[in-house]
């Protein structure tokens, strides 16, 4: 029940409080060079891409947010239905609750709303140090018919929660066991503080093929925990990390330095399809957003669909104005960083 209460707190705080990182994602330092003569018909712009052996109509992921409560069930169902209509991917929030409270399954079950989407199950990697087994990880995947399992890394969040899990020792070998055991790929994801080149390499070396950088610039989970603090000391500790983390753009570059061959998701502080286009150009395969979708999904499926359409149109216009007919063309679009051309 404590886990369910925490999830309720997280939704309410994210919807009503300012929990943004004090750091920028870094994408404002990157600008596309405008192409005044693209020689393309806008109606022929192709935003499709392939991810986890499925075709996405746009390289967009509704990043993991919630689950485990009635409100979360409604949010997830609206997100999934909108993702199905748009042909984009979706991640579920942490499913640890399901292992202790089986009755929460319906808060994560969205396949009836979204039979065709790329769907990602999710649990905190540190739970492998607290008794969660590879077999249970497979159960999470099977229970929602997911295409992959996210193991999220939230060390700073855990350390700033009074009830947080603080033993992160010898975790990498356990993650490797899950990678080798599962019938689907494992995605390693930070939660808003970024992955370094060194950390990325550690996961690549044990067989992980997909990384979500989830850098700084968007939601800061230490700030969320500051609002949950039950005394002033806990609040002051959590609040002091507002400027912590690797900005998303920097993390994206670091992960790409670690490997050109893995799949990379860019998330963390992306505000628009323009930021998403920049992320694709800088090495991401797809890009994820959470905050804009959460607020919409708390109201209606139609608002989620409108938000998705906004991001897709921003992406398409960016592609048109850079002369990029396809996502592969966009990856080579002319770009300037801090007023210096990038090639």
From Swiss-Prot:
<feature type="binding site">
    <location>
        <begin position="64"/>
        <end position="66"/>
    </location>
    <ligand>
        <name>FMN</name>
    </ligand>
</feature>
<dbReference type="GO" id="GO:0070402">
    <property type="term" value="F:NADPH binding"/>
</dbReference>
<dbReference type="GO" id="GO:0010181">
    <property type="term" value="F:FMN binding"/>
</dbReference>
<dbReference type="GO" id="GO:0016491">
    <property type="term" value="F:oxidoreductase activity"/>
</dbReference>
<keyword id="KW-0479">Metal-binding</keyword>
<dbReference type="GO" id="GO:0000287">
    <property type="term" value="F:magnesium ion binding"/>
</dbReference>
<feature type="binding site">
    <location>
        <position position="157"/>
    </location>
    <ligand>
        <name>substrate</name>
    </ligand>
</feature>
<feature type="binding site">
    <location>
        <begin position="269"/>
        <end position="271"/>
    </location>
    <ligand>
        <name>FMN</name>
    </ligand>
</feature>
<keyword id="KW-0963">Cytoplasm</keyword>
<dbReference type="Pfam" id="PF01070">
    <property type="entry name" value="FMN_dh"/>
</dbReference>
<dbReference type="InterPro" id="IPR011179">
    <property type="entry name" value="IPdP_isomerase"/>
</dbReference>
<keyword id="KW-0414">Isoprene biosynthesis</keyword>
<dbReference type="GO" id="GO:0008299">
    <property type="term" value="P:isoprenoid biosynthetic process"/>
</dbReference>
<feature type="binding site">
    <location>
        <begin position="290"/>
        <end position="291"/>
    </location>
    <ligand>
        <name>FMN</name>
    </ligand>
</feature>
<keyword id="KW-0460">Magnesium</keyword>
<protein>
    <recommendedName>
        <fullName>Isopentenyl-diphosphate delta-isomerase</fullName>
        <ecNumber>5.3.3.2</ecNumber>
    </recommendedName>
</protein>
<dbReference type="GO" id="GO:0004452">
    <property type="term" value="F:isopentenyl-diphosphate delta-isomerase activity"/>
</dbReference>
<comment type="function">
    <text>Involved in the biosynthesis of isoprenoids. Catalyzes the 1,3-allylic rearrangement of the homoallylic substrate isopentenyl (IPP) to its allylic isomer, dimethylallyl diphosphate (DMAPP).</text>
</comment>
<keyword id="KW-0413">Isomerase</keyword>
<feature type="binding site">
    <location>
        <begin position="94"/>
        <end position="96"/>
    </location>
    <ligand>
        <name>substrate</name>
    </ligand>
</feature>
<comment type="subunit">
    <text>Homooctamer. Dimer of tetramers.</text>
</comment>
<feature type="binding site">
    <location>
        <position position="63"/>
    </location>
    <ligand>
        <name>FMN</name>
    </ligand>
</feature>
<comment type="similarity">
    <text>Belongs to the IPP isomerase type 2 family.</text>
</comment>
<feature type="binding site">
    <location>
        <position position="94"/>
    </location>
    <ligand>
        <name>FMN</name>
    </ligand>
</feature>
<dbReference type="GO" id="GO:0005737">
    <property type="term" value="C:cytoplasm"/>
</dbReference>
<feature type="binding site">
    <location>
        <position position="219"/>
    </location>
    <ligand>
        <name>FMN</name>
    </ligand>
</feature>
<keyword id="KW-0288">FMN</keyword>
<feature type="binding site">
    <location>
        <position position="158"/>
    </location>
    <ligand>
        <name>Mg(2+)</name>
    </ligand>
</feature>
<keyword id="KW-0521">NADP</keyword>
<feature type="binding site">
    <location>
        <position position="122"/>
    </location>
    <ligand>
        <name>FMN</name>
    </ligand>
</feature>
<keyword id="KW-0285">Flavoprotein</keyword>
<feature type="binding site">
    <location>
        <position position="189"/>
    </location>
    <ligand>
        <name>FMN</name>
    </ligand>
</feature>
<dbReference type="InterPro" id="IPR000262">
    <property type="entry name" value="FMN-dep_DH"/>
</dbReference>
<dbReference type="InterPro" id="IPR013785">
    <property type="entry name" value="Aldolase_TIM"/>
</dbReference>
<feature type="binding site">
    <location>
        <begin position="6"/>
        <end position="7"/>
    </location>
    <ligand>
        <name>substrate</name>
    </ligand>
</feature>
